[in-house]
């Protein structure tokens, strides 16, 4: 497992960024996910750390390359805790290795 953006991921992220840039002033969260296979490397001691790095790679790309406002974005890792597919198959594990970008409506700041 790795958190580096591949050329294919950058191409997809460019398309996504162009589509969601109009929501740049909304609150945006970026969540990294992994499959359930244990990982233990010097760079990523566990799946949680790998998922954090995956999300932060996307966050950094959007801020540094696409002009997104860092003040309205957060990144976090969920590890293997929120699967969307069966981790017992290669296809399911591949689906679980992902980054999700969520956009939230701005709340009325006058309410205290």
What is each stretch, according to the model?
Residues 2-23, 33-112:
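Periplasmic OmpA-like peptidoglycan-binding domain that tethers envelope proteins to the cell wall
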């Amino acid at each position: 497992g790795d958190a580096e953006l591949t050329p294919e991921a950058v191409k997809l992220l460019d398309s996504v960024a162009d589509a969601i840039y109009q929501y740049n002033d909304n609150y945006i969260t970026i969540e990294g996910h992994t499959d359930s296979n244990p990982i233990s490397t010097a760079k990523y001691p566990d799946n949680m750390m790998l998922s954090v790095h995956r999300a932060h790679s996307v966050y950094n790309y959007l801020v540094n390359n696409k002009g997104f406002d860092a003040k309205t974005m957060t990144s976090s890792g969920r590890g293997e805790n929120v699967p969307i597919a069966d981790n017992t198959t290669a296809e399911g594990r591949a689906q679980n290795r992902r980054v999700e970008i969520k956009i939230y409506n701005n709340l009325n700041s006058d309410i205290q």
